[in-house]
Amino acid sequence: MPNTLEQFKSITTIVADTGDIEAIKRYQPEDATTNPSLILKAAQIPDYAHLIENAIEWAKSQSDSIEQQVEDAGDKLAVNIGVEILKIVPGRISTEVDARLSFDKAGSITKAHKLIKLYKEAGIDKSRILIKLASTWEGICAAKELEQEGINCNLTLLFSFAQARACAEAGVYLISPFVGRILDWYKKDTGLEYSSVEDPGVVSVTEIYNYYKRHGFNTVVMGASFRNTGEIIELAGCDRLTIGPALLEELANSQTEVVRKLIPTETVVDAADPLTEAQFRWEFNEDPMAVEKLAEGIRNFAIDQGKLEVMLKEKLAC
């Protein structure tokens, strides 16, 4: 009998949530995702030193301003790591726009264009890239314009149905609803423990998946941010799941039988009219968990981006 991970691959596209190339080689996912926290972690791996050096030298050649060099080096490093990962995975890499642009539509679009240009200069076509943006109203609007240009997007830090609905209505290629972080909030708020089937994060992704399929939306649902394999098993059949190395290892070492839980409906019905900005903001604001976790996620990604920039600034000064 195939291990649990191999069983999963027959019904759900498995994506590696890591910048660790060795882990990606080990588990052979279809795609990979990165974020500022994972880039910061990857930058401390000795085998990546040459990627950092390349980013530093490139940044120095682009500007005399140290602030601009730091920004350029960060962008180039993210792309360098993405290029290395794409030598292994057959599918796509998700590369994230600076979290500090989460409420800046124009800035997000400009940064996305820059990342796509850097990938193109490295010989990577945009068809293999997903631009990650936070699921703010501004991020969703930026993604809508980018999608119309043929640049596919991955809307991340998604915690609510309102965010998911707005993403689908904007024609976003893929969303990443965060399962584990939703569970974290409810456990802290209620003091309760949840079985995998009752897990609020699992329930949220299931609702989003069913809504998309029932109304014929093509946006891919990729569950993310898992705390345990039970959550993953309950989402068998989801379009994609992005999983960190530790849980990929657990699945690879398990013989648990995988039974498909999410099944697309055969009947498609028309959806309601798209949310207006006012409706989106009200519905999102009505979910205190989503409001708190989105704000926290943006802050934490920005903090790690700042830590990475401190490291790069030190190297640029050498």
UniProtKB/Swiss-Prot annotation:
InterPro entries: Aldolase_TIM (IPR013785), TAL/FSA (IPR001585), Transaldolase_1 (IPR004730), Transaldolase_AS (IPR018225)
UniProt pathway: Carbohydrate degradation; pentose phosphate pathway; D-glyceraldehyde 3-phosphate and beta-D-fructose 6-phosphate from D-ribose 5-phosphate and D-xylulose 5-phosphate (non-oxidative stage): step 2/3
EC code: 2.2.1.2
Active site: 132
Localisation: Cytoplasm
Reaction(s) catalysed (UniProt annotation): D-sedoheptulose 7-phosphate + D-glyceraldehyde 3-phosphate = D-erythrose 4-phosphate + beta-D-fructose 6-phosphate
Main localisation: cytoplasm
Keyword set, alphabetical order: Cytoplasm, Pentose shunt, Schiff base, Transferase
One Pfam entry name: TAL_FSA
GO molecular function, one term: transaldolase activity
PROSITE patterns: TRANSALDOLASE_1, TRANSALDOLASE_2
GO process annotations (BP): carbohydrate metabolic process; pentose-phosphate shunt
The keyword Transmembrane appears for this protein: no
Gene Ontology CC entries for this record: cytosol
Family to which the UniProt record says this protein belongs: Belongs to the transaldolase family. Type 1 subfamily.
Quaternary context: Homodimer.
PANTHER family hit by this protein: TRANSALDOLASE
UniProt function note: Transaldolase is important for the balance of metabolites in the pentose-phosphate pathway.
Name of the molecule in the record: Transaldolase
Lineage: Bacteria, Pseudomonadati, Pseudomonadota, Gammaproteobacteria, Alteromonadales
